[in-house]
Amino acid sequence: MWNDEDNNPYGSFERRDSFASSTNPASPTARDYSIDARFPTPQDVRYDAPLTPSDAGDDEVPGPTYPREASDAATDDETDDQAHGELVPRRKPGGYDSRIEQMLYENPELPILITEAGKSQESGGRFIVYTIKTGDLTVRRRYSEFASLRDALTRLHPTLVIPPIPEKHTMADYAANPTNAKQDQQIIDLRKRMLAVFLNRCRRMEQVRTDGVWWRFLDPNSSWTEVLHSHPVSSIPKQIMKAPPLDPANPTAGHSFLPVPSSSAKLKTLPTQALDSAAAASLARFPPDANSLSEQDLDAYFIAFETSIKDLESLLTGPMEKVNRRTLNHLSSLASDLSELGARYNAFALSETAPTVSAAIERVGQAADSSYIATEELSTSLSASFAEPMRESAQFAGVVRNVLRYRILKRVQQEMTTDELNKKKALLESLERSEAEARRIDQYLSSSQQIQPPRREPPAQHRRDGSGEDTASIDSDFPPTHSDFSQAPSAKIGAPERTGGSPSHKKAASTSITNKIFGPIRHAVQGVVDVDPERTRRDTIGKTRESIVQLEQAQIASAKDVKDASASVLKDLKRFQREKEDDLKRYMLAYAKSQIEWAKKNQETWEEAKAEVNKINES
């Protein structure tokens, strides 16, 4: 139950298992039409109880049934059975890891409800938490945890159209209400409705329901932080393009060698020129047999689908949104005017003395009051059952474009891998030709040296010895006294050997200075100039061969990724198209139902007022 201290509707929970309603009676969620316009009433819902003992009382009222959608992992026969409501409870082979998993597996149509929204007692009342009820199990999650769940699902299933969640607070919200923007009751009620829709849409997706992450979000015994830091979420590569599309948490060795295209990369060759709206409309929405078409042929269908989605998004976020907002504002203004008009008629009736006239005027005032209430309900009903789903459809358009963009990036990645592999093969061929040419030249030079050995000059020592002998023979012709001049003078013995050692010292000093100045330059030049081109060429050949082996693995992985991504995206787009058509049908019916109910209420009250006014003439 709520702590109503200070009249705070967001008071903290007094106990964790509390299910008392905290909904503001004036909010849209407290009205029957907000659920009826989208889903049946809770009394109309029946589902099989889980096969495990129930922890809650038998007086729990199950939640509303959401529209049934065919599972994208089911066969054609299973899809037909689901469409006719013939889905029967089933058992999972191998057992269950959690009670919530058993409930969802055996009762795939079990609705998920968000019953409450309020400040969390554990966080000191700083955060708004949403109470999620699945059968008889409840768990509380913050909006940021919903956002992290959706982010994890988009990384785990990049080829699936994961439903959107309500947007975060905008800067305009904080500017308009800087202190209580996060506690705005209308925004909280909106999030309650749309987050429940998000969870139930995920429930109808077979891959999401069985990936081991989504149902842990609903498990009260699971720590969401631990789930995000454990397999499979933690095993997904940081760069999603280096992971397989159907199982990103288990990439192969070849995926680590894949190049990563930029987010704005485009295909080199498009199948046709950019399709406009008319050309996209003339093309069939989906290919008749995707298995017999190449990736280039499938590109045209994906481009046509993306064009139609862009047109839908521009329509929903442009004229439709403006007209919707203007209509709701007019209805709110009309309701205020009717409220004031009813008050004026009631005051006027008190001043009238004639009983019949006074009663007639009072009845007109009551009719105006009734019209005020009906118009206010109509405005809120259209906002909840029509305007909000239209905004969600616009968000879906952005999600679809991201999924199609992922497939395009996979195609670009395949082209980049093929181009890089061709470049490496051409480089290897060039290096091998250079190596063969160098070996041929070495072999030719070796054979030439064996046939005509070059003439060898006498060694330098031999020449010096010969010159010494000649000098000795010349000196022998002179008297010995002439040899005294060849000796050093006597002054050389006593004098320091400064003159003899000075040139060598100067030369060494100049050499060290030169090394300091030109050493780094010489080192840099040696780094640029290949001192051993043959060894460098052999090393380059080895590295190139290794790169080719890696790129061949990457090419195999990329080809499989593109094929799997195209098949999975096409399959999920078909599911999304069926769901979108059903949603639009439901939105239009909800719009018509709201208008009919509003008109019936007004007709009934004003006919009663007319009958009361006619009594004046009779009297």
Swiss-Prot record:
Residues 108-224 form the PX domain. GO terms for molecular function: phosphatidylinositol-3-phosphate binding. It comes from Neurospora crassa (strain ATCC 24698 / 74-OR23-1A / CBS 708.71 / DSM 1257 / FGSC 987). The gene is vsp-6. This is Sorting nexin-41. It is found in: Endosome membrane; Endomembrane system. SMART domains: PX (SM00312). SUPFAM superfamilies: PX domain (SSF64268). A 1,2-diacyl-sn-glycero-3-phospho-(1D-myo-inositol-3-phosphate) binds at R142, S144, K168, R191. The PX domain binds phosphatidylinositol 3-phosphate which is necessary for peripheral membrane localization to the perivacuolar punctate structures. It holds the Pfam family PX. InterPro entries: AH/BAR_dom_sf (IPR027267), PX_dom (IPR001683), PX_dom_sf (IPR036871), PX_Snx41/Atg20 (IPR044106), Sorting_Nexin_Autophagy (IPR051079), Vps5_C (IPR015404). Keywords: Autophagy, Endosome, Lipid-binding, Membrane, Protein transport, Transport. GO terms for biological process: autophagy of mitochondrion; protein transport; reticulophagy; retrograde transport, endosome to Golgi. GO terms for cellular component: cytosol; endosome membrane; phagophore assembly site. Its main location: membrane. The lineage of its organism: Eukaryota, Fungi, Dikarya, Ascomycota, Pezizomycotina. May be required for cytoplasm to vacuole transport (Cvt) and pexophagy. Residues 454-467 have a biased composition (Basic and acidic residues). It is a peripheral membrane protein. Belongs to the sorting nexin family. Residues 1-95, 444-510 are annotated as: Disordered.
